[in-house]
């Protein structure tokens, strides 16, 4: 049956206009712990069982699940619900906490990517709604616990991708500084997989002061714009995309000072925007991250390969390599 082109275009337009509903509904399911309830149950669950386990009344839960099943998140058989391979990715041990981080009132504010914000260069996401920095304003609603849990989930998954897809990453490396390492989730997972490495989680003093002990990881407080602990390698995981080119060059120069000239390396774990060729499964997500950075920050961004090369050259690195670790980030290794 032929589809009227005008009807098809209008259908696509409606999908775009209402597209924000899908992640919002998925966040609600994660908040209700639906993926974990189904995973822990280990099989099909009736609506009544799922309602009792989640504490959500039957009627809204039915409508929520109907929507998410349509979009391929969960499955249904004989009027009972079950996990799908996709919904398993949103359990508490996977991307569930990151999904909740993206569902806080500030992160979901459409004002950050408004026409006004783009014209003025001041993202309403953080500052212009109340004239102050919402990262430090709990009353506005940015839940720091959600942020911390979300970033920890991201760090855990990215570290696992490095272990699986780049098993030689730390050959010959005895010590690694994880800049912006917060509570050491990423470096802890890496040290666990590569036990000959001594990990150093480096972050602001007030951040590392609250860090729980981790085997093989030392916590050091400081300022990355002043100096870094000496080590064989320095890792920057999801750090440089927060900063302008000039600030990135400053940070990279400090990293270069912290490693041995002949054998050291800086490991940048960050997205690379594809502007040439076909890209991969994560190309769309990386572009979405760039929109997020434009909404969140005044100068942060995701960068193309050419933009990364420019930063490395300006910071004085002589060569670099790029490793695809089959996730949203790559590992860019820069050598003095």
Swiss-Prot record:
Protein name: Flavonoid 6-O-methyltransferase 4
Enzyme Commission number(s) of this protein: 2.1.1.-
Enzyme active site: 241 (proton acceptor)
Entry keyword set: Methyltransferase, S-adenosyl-L-methionine, Transferase
Disulfide links within the chain: none
Pfam families noted in UniProt: Dimerisation, Methyltransf_2
Pathway(s) it belongs to: Flavonoid metabolism
Upper classification of the organism: Eukaryota, Viridiplantae, Streptophyta, Embryophyta, Tracheophyta
Subunit organization: Homodimer.
Gene transcribed to yield this protein: FOMT4
Catalytic activity entry: ladanein + S-adenosyl-L-methionine = salvigenin + S-adenosyl-L-homocysteine + H(+); scutellarein 7-methyl ether + S-adenosyl-L-methionine = cirsimaritin + S-adenosyl-L-homocysteine + H(+)
Xref: InterPro entries: COMT-like, O_MeTrfase_dom, Plant_O-MeTrfase_dimerisation, SAM-dependent_MTases_sf, WH-like_DNA-bd_sf, WH_DNA-bd_sf
Acyltransferase in keyword set: no
Use of this protein: Nevadensin is a selective inhibitor of human carboxylesterase 1 (hCE-1), a key enzyme responsible for the hydrolysis of a wide range of endogenous and xenobiotic esters.
UniProt xrefs under PROSITE patterns: SAM_OMT_II
Expression sites by tissue: Expressed in leaves.
Record has Transferase as a keyword: yes
């Amino acid at each position: 049956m032929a589809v009227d082109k005008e009807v098809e275009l209008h259908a696509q337009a409606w999908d775009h206009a209402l597209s924000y509903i899908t992640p919002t509904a998925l966040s609600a399911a994660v908040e209700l712990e639906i993926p974990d309830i189904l995973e822990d149950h280990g099989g099909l669950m009736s609506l009544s069982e799922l309602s009792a386990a989640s504490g959500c009344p039957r009627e809204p839960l039915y409508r929520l699940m109907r929507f998410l099943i349509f979009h391929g998140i969960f499955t249904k058989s004989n009027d009972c619900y079950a996990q799908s391979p996709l919904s398993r990715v949103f359990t508490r041990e996977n991307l569930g906490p990151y999904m909740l981080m993206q569902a806080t009132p500030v992160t979901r504010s459409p004002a950050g990517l408004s026409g006004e914000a783009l014209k003025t260069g001041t993202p309403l996401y953080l500052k212009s709604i109340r004239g102050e920095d919402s990262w430090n304003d709990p009353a506005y609603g940015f839940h720091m616990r959600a942020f911390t849990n979300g970033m920890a989930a991201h760090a855990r998954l990215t570290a696992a991708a490095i272990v699986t897809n780049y098993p030689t990453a730390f050959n010959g490396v005895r010590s690694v500084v994880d800049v912006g390492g917060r509570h050491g989730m990423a470096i802890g997972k890496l040290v666990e997989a590569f036990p000959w490495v001594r990990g150093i989680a480096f972050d602001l003093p007030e951040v590392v002061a609250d860090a729980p002990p981790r085997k093989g990881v030392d916590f050091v407080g400081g300022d990355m714009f002043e100096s870094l602990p000496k080590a064989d390698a320095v890792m920057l995981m999801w750090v440089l995309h927060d900063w302008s080119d000039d600030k990135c060059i400053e940070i990279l120069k400090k990293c270069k000072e912290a490693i041995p000239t002949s054998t050291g390396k800086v490991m940048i774990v960050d997205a690379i925007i594809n502007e040439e060729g076909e890209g991969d499964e994560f190309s769309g997500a990386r572009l979405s991250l760039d929109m997020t950075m434009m909404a969140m920050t005044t100068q942060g961004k995701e960068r193309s390969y050419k933009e990364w090369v420019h930063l490395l050259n300006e910071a004085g690195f002589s060569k670099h390599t790029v490793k695809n670790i089959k996730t949203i980030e790559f590992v860019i290794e820069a050598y003095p």
